[in-house]
Curated annotation (Swiss-Prot):
Documented EC number(s): 5.3.1.26
Organism, as annotated: Streptococcus pyogenes serotype M18 (strain MGAS8232)
Pathway: Carbohydrate metabolism; D-galactose 6-phosphate degradation; D-tagatose 6-phosphate from D-galactose 6-phosphate: step 1/1
Top enzyme class: isomerase
Keyword line: Isomerase, Lactose metabolism
Catalytic activity, as annotated: aldehydo-D-galactose 6-phosphate = keto-D-tagatose 6-phosphate
SUPFAM superfamilies hit by this protein: Ribose/Galactose isomerase RpiB/AlsB
Protein's recorded name: Galactose-6-phosphate isomerase subunit LacB 2
Subunit structure: Heteromultimeric protein consisting of LacA and LacB.
Isomerase keyword on record: yes
Record Gene3D superfamilies: Sugar-phosphate isomerase, RpiB/LacA/LacB
GO molecular function: galactose-6-phosphate isomerase activity; ribose-5-phosphate isomerase activity
Length: 171
């Protein structure tokens, strides 16, 4: 399976471990970054993962930031994405079987790597169970998505990147 993976600078090592694990399981990975610990922001990488999945370049996605909250919210803004922030196998399976989630998010500083791998395995093994009720819920959720023209601009994050270059952000 082709899986897009992305993270922010806080959890780069955790993302690398997930990528390595998925490769050992025979999956093809689209590594959307980030690739080091240089300060950045999660929306950039959530957007990249979301676009890879929504375009069909990847079948599913995994996003990771410190708590998982920010990057999961960011990836959910990409039209066609249904992402779930998960911390256990039950939630991951539910998100796939009932809501047809195509991205899962993790808090890399909240959950350990081995558990994260187990949850990813459970998510990948789960299959969407289409029912009339599930289809209605998904249609309702999807109807809430409206892409803005600004979002398609390749310079969408430039103002923030310029601030980082000027040293205006501090951890």
């Amino acid at each position: 399976m082709k899986i897009a993976v992305g993270c922010d600078h806080i959890v780069t090592y955790e993302k690398i471990a997930v990528v390595d694990y998925l490769k050992t399981q025979g999956h093809e990975i689209i590594d959307c970054g980030t690739y080091d610990n240089v300060r950045t922001h999660y929306p950039i990488f959530g957007k990249k993962v979301g676009e890879a999945v929504a375009s069909g370049k990847a079948e599913l996605g995994v996003v990771i930031c410190g708590t998982g909250v920010g990057i999961t919210n960011a990836v959910n803004k990409v039209p066609g994405i249904r992402a779930a922030l998960v911390r256990d196998m039950t939630s991951a399976i539910y998100s796939k079987e009932e809501l047809n989630a195509n991205v899962i998010g993790f808090g890399g500083k909240i959950i350990g790597g081995l558990l994260m791998n187990d949850i990813i395995d459970a998510f990948l093994a789960a299959e969407y169970k289409p029912t009339e009720e599930n289809k209605k819920w998904i249609e309702k959720m999807d109807s809430l998505q409206h892409a803005s023209q600004d979002q398609n601009n390749p310079h969408f994050f430039d103002e923030f990147l310029e601030k980082w270059v000027r040293g205006e952000y501090h951890d």
